[in-house]
Each structure stands twice: as structure tokens, then as C-alpha cells.
Swiss-Prot record:
This is Bicarbonate transport system permease protein CmpB. Residues 86-267 form the ABC transmembrane type-1 domain. GO terms for molecular function: nitrate transmembrane transporter activity. Induction: By carbon dioxide-limited conditions, probably via CmpR. The gene is cmpB. PANTHER family: ALKANE SULFONATE ABC TRANSPORTER-RELATED, MEMBRANE SUBUNIT (PTHR30151), NITRATE IMPORT PERMEASE PROTEIN NRTB (PTHR30151:SF7). Signal peptide: none annotated. InterPro entries: MetI-like, MetI-like_sf, NtrB. GO terms for biological process: monoatomic ion transport. The complex is composed of two ATP-binding proteins (CmpC and CmpD), a transmembrane protein (CmpB) and a solute-binding protein (CmpA). It is a multi-pass membrane protein.
């Protein structure tokens, strides 16, 4: 005789197997897609239809294989492994992005709380955010006369707008009930800011931060390609192109994509952690 407990136990097995199957699908299907893309790319390259090397060139080209196996290589000057090139670019991104986050969130809150200020500044913000990052490079070089501060400025001016605009929108979307409660409780401005404005606007702020971190990474790569004589993965790509090291470029592009993905995931994790602990 089958008991109710056994029925429940047997009934739970398919759901457990289904969960494991879903987890495996979440891993195997993306891997299958990537593998299929690499195979098609290699076949297309081997057929002679293009001069673009296939993914196997990362292992068959001696110089590229050295870069792949020895990312911490440092011969001094600009001759560094991809780890150090990436770290140099990330350092600039961290500086420019941090400045953009501080200014973007602060100004965004002010603009979101003040309708007249928003009406006065919004057209200027919309105008400036439409300017491509590369267009700022010559202006930054003329203004700062040095590559490092110019690169940081390009990152800042690229990243600040999505942070500022999303923060302002988040503040404007605060429910009126929250504001009414704050008035009834006679909250001070600082307490209103910390207890009402920031928690309510936080999802919008992090949306802006996620957009901005991706744009910052794209901007520094583009800026470093234009700027000469600096350590960074963007200049590494341009230098490899000048010397016709196409396999090196492909490896650097893989680094760029992987780092960009990690940056986005880090900001998403930070958002979940902060919201969970508030």
C-alpha cells in the first residue's frame, strides 16, 4: 500500500530533476551557442573567404600564445602583458566613473527635487549627452594637455549623463504618499534625503550606474586608441593593428568583452547587496 508520504516524496522527484535540468540548460545552452559560433568562425576563416584569423590563431601564433599564457609579462615601458594593459584602463575607468557617480547622483537629486532647476538644465543635459565620447577627446587633450587627465575626463563626461538623468527621474517618481508622511513627521532635510529620497530612487540610480559603467568601458577603449603612448588595452589594440598583429587584437577584444561583462555583473550584485541590507 502506497502511503501519502511516499506519494508526496515521489511527486517531488520530477520537480527536483526539472530544476537540475534547468540549471544545466542555463550553463550548457550558452556554452553550445559560443562553441557553435567559434566553429563557424574557424570554418569561415579556414576557407580563405577572409583574412581574419580564426580562434585557433590564439594558440598557433607564437606572439599571441605568449600574451595568452603570460598576461603578467612586463618588459617595461609600453611592452606589458594584457593584465597590466587592462589594469591601466580599469584604473582610469574607476577614477572617471567615481567622479561621474558622485556628481551625477548629487546633481540628479537636486534637479529631481526642484522643478524649476530641472526645466532650466534639462535641455543642456540632453544636448551634452548626445555628443559622442570620441568628440570629447581632442577637446580634453587641448584643455588638459596630458593623456591621463584627458582620458579620465572623457570617461566622466560619458558616464555622468545616464547617472544624472536616471537619478533625477527616480526622485521625481517618489510616491506622493511618502512626501506627505515626511511632512507629517516633520523630517529634517537630511533625514528626508536619507530615509525617503535615496531608498526610493535607488533602483533608478543603479540603472544609471549600470548603463554608465558599460559606457565608461567603451569610452576608455575608444579614447586610448586615439591617444598615443599610454599603457592601456585601447592603445594596445591600435599598436597591434599598426603592426598587423590581428590575432593579438582578437585576444584583446576577448579581454574587453569579459571585463565589460564582469563590470556589469559587479554593479548588479552591488545593487542587490545594498537593497538587501537597507
Amino acid at each position: 500500500m502506497v502511503t501519502a508520504r511516499e506519494t508526496r516524496r515521489n511527486g517531488s522527484r520530477p520537480s527536483g530533476l526539472k530544476k537540475w535540468r534547468q540549471k544545466l540548460d542555463g550553463i550548457l545552452l550558452p556554452l553550445a551557442g559560443i562553441l557553435g559560433f567559434l566553429i563557424i568562425w574557424q570554418i569561415f576563416s579556414s576557407s580563405g573567404a577572409t583574412r581574419l584569423p580564426g580562434p585557433l590563431s590564439l594558440f598557433t601564433e607564437e606572439r599571441t600564445r605568449e600574451l595568452l599564457l603570460y598576461p603578467f609579462l612586463d618588459r617595461g615601458g609600453l611592452d606589458k602583458g594584457l593584465f597590466w594593459q587592462t589594469i591601466a584602463s580599469l584604473t582610469r575607468v574607476a577614477q572617471g566613473f567615481s567622479i561621474a557617480a558622485i556628481i551625477g547622483i548629487s546633481v540628479g537629486i537636486l534637479v529631481g527635487l526642484n522643478r524649476q532647476l530641472n526645466a532650466m538644465l534639462d535641455p543642456l543635459f540632453q544636448f551634452l549627452r548626445m555628443i559622442a565620447p570620441l568628440a570629447w577627446v581632442p577637446i580634453a587633450l587641448v584643455a588638459f594637455q596630458q593623456n591621463q587627465p584627458a582620458a579620465i575626463f572623457v570617461i566622466f563626461i560619458t558616464a555622468v549623463w545616464p547617472i544624472l538623468i536616471n537619478t533625477a527621474e527616480g526622485v521625481r517618481q517618489i510616491p506622493q504618499d511618502y512626501n506627505n508622511v515626511a511632512r507629517v513627521l516633520r523630517m529634517s532635510k537630511s533625514k528626508y534625503l536619507m530615509k525617503v529620497v535615496l531608498p526610493a530612487a535607488l533602483p533608478y540610480i543603479f540603472t544609471g550606474l549600470r548603463i554608465a559603467i558599460g559606457l565608461s568601458w567603451l569610452a576608455i577603449i575608444a579614447a586610448e586608441i586615439v591617444m598615443s603612448g599610454i599603457v592601456g588595452i585601447g592603445f594596445f589594440i591600435w599598436d597591434a593593428y599598426q603592426q598587423n598583429y590581428v590575432s593579438d587584437i582578437i585576444l584583446a577584444v576577448i579581454y574587453i568583452g569579459a571585463v565589460g561583462l564582469l563590470l556589469d555583473r559587479f554593479v548588479a550584485w552591488l545593487q542587490r547587496w545594498i537593497l538587501r541590507n537597507m
